[in-house]
Regions:
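Active-site loop immediately N-terminal to the catalytic Tyr-X3-Lys motif
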Residues: 104-107, 154-160, 182-183
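The beta1-alpha1 cofactor-binding region of Rossmann-like NAD(H)/NADP(H)-dependent oxidoreductases
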Residues: 47-48, 68-80, 111
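Substrate-binding pocket helix/loop in short-chain dehydrogenase/reductase
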Residues: 105-106, 113-118, 200
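Alpha-helical segment proximal to the catalytic Tyr-Lys
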Residues: 134, 178-182
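Conserved glycine-rich cofactor-binding loop
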Residues: 15, 22-23
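Residue(s) in the substrate-gating loop at a strand-loop-helix junction
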Residues: 149
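Active-site helix of classical SDR
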Residues: 129, 165, 173
Length: 208
């Protein structure tokens, strides 16, 4: 993955929550933010993934804070945000990174599978942002970054649910920016292409 030049920007004193950042793109974003002074907070759905993430951060000298939380569960998210605020501090930066993809032809995909992708990739960013925005308003502003994917712009075979979710996330990003810009909350989306994360590299290697 691309490396961030230390002190490319100053995040000293800022608390950044990156969802699903126990590995992959989320971890790379978190490491870049930490290199520029941010305090890193992340979540994952299983304790073993949180523990693995904490160990990976510790290996490079980052004291991260990890929480077990299902970001599709509004009550759990509200509880996590309250706990982070109490234990770490007010969240200044949110990166909605957690996501899943199911590569299944549309006619073979069940409605339940479609809903699961929409729930994680679209509903969850709404839930987490909704939980954090009131405190950002009270603190005088904040930053929200949504990982939208190039699939928010393109259609591809076998990813109908993922593309639909990411397209929706792109529009949610625009609406958050429009609705809360007056409160000094900036919301932007990033549409990365194919990134060689550990999981994707494993899948590529196994296909040869």
């Amino acid at each position: 993955m691309a490396q961030c030049t230390p002190k490319s920007f100053d995040l000293t004193g800022k608390v950044a929550l990156i969802t699903g950042a126990s590995y992959g793109i989320g971890m790379a974003i978190a490491k870049a933010m930490a290199a520029n002074g941010a305090t890193i907070v992340f979540n994952d759905i299983k304790q073993e993934l949180v523990d693995k993430g904490l160990a990976s951060y510790a290996e490079v000298g980052i004291k991260a804070h990890g929480y077990v939380c299902d970001v599709t569960d509004e009550d759990a998210v509200n509880a996590m945000v309250a706990k982070i605020t109490e234990e770490v501090g007010h969240i200044n930066i949110l990166v909605n990174n957690a996501g899943i993809i199911k590569r299944i032809p549309m006619t073979e995909m069940s409605a339940a599978q479609f809903r699961q992708v929409i729930d994680v990739d679209l509903n969850a960013p709404f839930i987490v942002a909704k939980a954090i925005i009131p405190d950002m308003i009270a603190q005088g502003g904040g930053k929200i970054i949504n990982i939208c994917s190039m699939m928010s712009e393109l259609g591809r075979e076998t990813v109908s649910a993922y593309a639909a979710a990411k397209g929706g996330l792109k529009m949610l990003t625009k609406n958050i920016a429009s609705e809360y810009g007056a409160y000094n909350i900036q919301c932007n989306g990033i549409g990365p292409g194919y990134i060689a994360t550990d999981r994707k590299s494993t899948r590529l290697n196994s296909s040869h």
